[in-house]
Amino acid sequence: MTTVEQSLSGMSGAAGILDRERIIATAGFNRWLVPPAALCIHLCIGMAYGFSVFWLPLSRAIGLTAPKACPDMSLLQELFTTSCDWRVASMGWMFTLFFVLLGVSAAIWGGWLERVGPRKAGVVAACCWAGGLVLGALGVYVHQLWLTWLGAGVIGGIGLGLGYISPVSTLIKWFPDHRGMATGFAIAGFGGGAMIGAPLANLLINYFKTPTDVGVWQTFLAMAAIYFFFMMVGAFRYRLPPAGWQPDGWTPPSEAKSMITQHQVHLKDAHKTPQFWLIWAVLCLNVSAGIGVIGMASPMLQEIFGGKLIGHPELGFNALSADQKTIIAGIAAGFAGLLSLFNIGGRVFWASLSDYIGRKNTYYTFFILGIILYASAPMFAQMGNKALFVAAFCIILSMYGGGFATVPAYLADMFGTLFVGAIHGRLLTAWSTAGIVGPVVVNYIREFQLAAGVPRDHLYDFTMYILCAMLIGGLICNFLVKPVADKWYMKPEEVAALQAAHAKSDAAIKHGSFGIGKGGFDLPSLIFWCFVGIPLAWGVWKTLQAAAALF
């Protein structure tokens, strides 16, 4: 047991309210209260996608009206300077910290989460994410980039990892009949967090800024308080089903027909199977392709279409005036917002669809359709057809999000539900890898093409074919996924012993609807869904307003 785990165990001993045994559901509990609890946490940590909203204000934190630049400053000097403004590129490393630490922390503490339950993990995630923002605010206030990286990037990144995986196995256990849909709803929140957080951050920055302050550190503190409240609500609303519980009238699907195992694979063995590494590669390649596009969505649209975006098809990007470039930058921001919306919607749509067509077939769809769309994108650009180009990338980003939301159910199908949260945590190292590979491939190919004199409207053609090759690799890996060999399955007595250990005080009902099938949503569940749904609806509305500039 690590020092972190020992301290957390001590905390639970003093405050048994966080113990796993305290959150076993009793008869009458409505399982539809669990997805909005997960959304409370995911909508908060999803702001990681929207952190770029802080870069421009922070790039003039000292200069105020314009950046106080120090061109000869090294990155090491930049970490400690108090007299020069930070470069946007240096602050952009926050994204790398976020997603590397997300994967690493999920892998390290996934097993601990399975032992202690989602409530304690959710509370620790809230403390890390909100606490990281507080430390980041201090870094902004004293103008120390290293402190901002440590707070928001490292400590916040640990909160991202624990918060991201905290609901996964719980939702899969509550919804064995709709695994994909349940995880799709929760993980959609991570994609939707920036839709709420970015416009909220803008509002707060404008409220707090003064002639002598850009208003960012105050915004960090305000958002830390808001996020801590919402995440604690989510953590304390988590409930676990009694061991062995299943919905009334539900019959587990046939293993032979569905590739859904009724057995369990232990956490210590899952990574020894070829299935784990094949699914790891499937996720990594799907995410590498999509995340590269997300990072370059705005400049890509501007450079490919140039004056076509504002009714001047004869003008390329370099021929535009400064004012015209400002206008098309606003249009491109709407494109990025639209991609974000499809990223979220795809998480619910594709994960829910996977319950009917199967996880393997869903990933076949991602790769085959993705290859077609990436290969067609240069043709759409050459045709000057903005609508087809935008539609293609909206579908691509829906499958990017769908890949995240479908993979927990894929793992549960392969390895069972007993350790799926911890196995998913280890698999998220694929995301950490993709977070480096995808942007590097897209950005460096763009720079190479630019240096070679390739016209801006053709800068991304070769990139699209490289991304196609990635998806072909993912398609092959998905094809190779077969059911896990019998030798890796736990013996029935081992499973029974673990379930008994997890249910010390649980003599509760093994079967029952827990409110589902006999009325569906009740008033408490409806109120809780509104609690998370109203902020999300506001974020969608703000995104649609920004996207309207495209048309």
Predicted regions and their residues:
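Hydrophobic core of transmembrane alpha-helices in multi-pass small-molecule transporters
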Residues: 43, 132, 145-162, 284, ...
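Glycine-rich segments within core transmembrane alpha-helices of 12-TM secondary carriers
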Residues: 176-199, 425-439
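C-terminal ends and interior cores of transmembrane alpha-helices
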Residues: 127-141, 368-382
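Symmetry-related core transmembrane helices of the 12-TM Major Facilitator Superfamily/SLC fold
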Residues: 217-237, 461-480
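Extracellular/periplasmic helix-loop-helix junction of adjacent transmembrane segments
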Residues: 54-104, 324-334
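Intracellular juxtamembrane helix-capping segments at the cytosolic ends
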Residues: 58, 161-175, 182-183, 402-415
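Extracytoplasmic gate region of multi-pass secondary transporters
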Residues: 49-58, 268-350, 435-443, 447, ...
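Central cavity-lining transmembrane alpha-helices of secondary-active solute carriers
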Residues: 93-111, 337-350
